[in-house]
């Protein structure tokens, strides 16, 4: 397991790096005192979870010996790595001017420029022992996150999770949906008294819908549309793609089609989840 320690000058992108690491499955803690690193590692060791911790100028130890002692007390299951983010002085000044945030070392008697220089001196012991130093001066937020994924995972894309969810329009459109498809125009099993109490997960309902060409056409055209744009979506710094399929009540057509799409992309090796809002409400 990896214990990734993220440090660097304020404004260099530590928060961005921590979010990217969290997306990669790391358990992330912001600004944890160095002396607590061994305790955190021991807590996570039994759970087999890699961790990432940010350390800034406000919680660096008073002496390098304290940091070394904390590293020596880590459980053997963890491999510590120190990532140090930096940027040139003018870039840091510009970023602070753009965000209008206060530098951690700023005070009435210390200008932003002086605070940046002082911070650089205080962080030099960490910088000197870093396993990886990244200059973010010319990087965007997305480029930094992508670079970290490439270095740590060995591939350019992180795995996108495709979520197919069914819903009923009478209950409202899901607010987390990236795409919404309306299937209320398709043949409705609701009007068959035998099928009405069933759901799109039941075989008789599936057989009913499977008999209609327009259902097959809709599924084919929808999955073709998603396949066309999926490569770009996978490289667009997102963790989830939520596709919502809606019918009137969210019980028959939308459930069946959401499952069909989920099964198709799952068979193509994609990371897929499916959920059915109306059916979940009925269980509670």
Swiss-Prot record:
Pfam families: PapZ_C (PF22740), RapZ-like_N (PF03668). InterPro entries: P-loop_NTPase (IPR027417), RapZ-like (IPR005337), RapZ-like_N (IPR053930), RapZ_C (IPR053931). Keywords: ATP-binding, GTP-binding, Nucleotide-binding, RNA-binding. It comes from the Bacteria. Gene3D superfamilies: P-loop containing nucleotide triphosphate hydrolases. SUPFAM superfamilies: P-loop containing nucleoside triphosphate hydrolases. GO terms for molecular function: ATP binding; GTP binding; RNA binding. Residues 266-284 are annotated as: RNA-binding. GTP binds at residues 56-59. ATP binds at residues 8-15. Modulates the synthesis of GlmS, by affecting the processing and stability of the regulatory small RNA GlmZ. When glucosamine-6-phosphate (GlcN6P) concentrations are high in the cell, RapZ binds GlmZ and targets it to cleavage by RNase E. Consequently, GlmZ is inactivated and unable to activate GlmS synthesis. Under low GlcN6P concentrations, RapZ is sequestered and inactivated by an other regulatory small RNA, GlmY, preventing GlmZ degradation and leading to synthesis of GlmS. Belongs to the RapZ-like family. RapZ subfamily. PANTHER family: RNASE ADAPTER PROTEIN RAPZ (PTHR30448:SF0). NCBIfam families: PRK05416.1 (NF003828). Homotrimer. This is RNase adapter protein RapZ. It comes from Salmonella typhi. The gene is rapZ.
């Amino acid at each position: 397991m990896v214990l990734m320690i993220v440090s660097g000058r304020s404004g260099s992108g530590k928060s961005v790096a921590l979010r990217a690491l969290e997306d990669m499955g790391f358990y992330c803690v912001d600004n944890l005192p160095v002396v607590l690193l061994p305790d955190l590692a021991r807590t996570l060791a039994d759970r087999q979870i890699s961790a990432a911790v940010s350390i800034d100028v406000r919680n660096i130890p008073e002496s390098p010996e304290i940091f070394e002692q904390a590293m020596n007390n880590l459980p053997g299951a963890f491999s510590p790595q120190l990532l140090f983010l930096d940027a040139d002085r003018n870039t840091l000044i510009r970023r602070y001017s753009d965000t209008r945030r206060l530098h951690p070392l700023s005070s009435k008697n210390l200008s932003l420029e002086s605070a940046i220089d002082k911070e650089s001196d205080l962080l030099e012991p960490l910088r000197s022992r870093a396993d990886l130093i990244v200059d973010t001066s010319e990087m965007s937020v997305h480029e930094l996150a992508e670079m970290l994924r490439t270095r740590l995972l060995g591939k350019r894309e992180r795995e996108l999770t495709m979520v197919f969810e069914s819903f009923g329009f009478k209950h409202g459109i899901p607010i987390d949906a990236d795409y919404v498809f309306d299937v209320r125009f398709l043949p409705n099993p609701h009007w068959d008294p035998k099928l009405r109490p069933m759901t799109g997960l039941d075989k008789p309902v599936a057989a009913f819908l499977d008999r209609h060409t327009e259902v097959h056409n809709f599924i084919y055209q929808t999955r073709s549309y998603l396949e066309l744009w999926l490569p770009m979506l996978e490289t667009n710094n997102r963790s989830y793609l939520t596709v919502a399929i809606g019918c009137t009540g969210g019980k028959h057509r939308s459930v069946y089609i959401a499952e069909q799409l989920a099964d198709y992309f799952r068979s193509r090796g994609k990371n897929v989840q499916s959920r059915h809002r109306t059916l979940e409400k009925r269980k509670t």
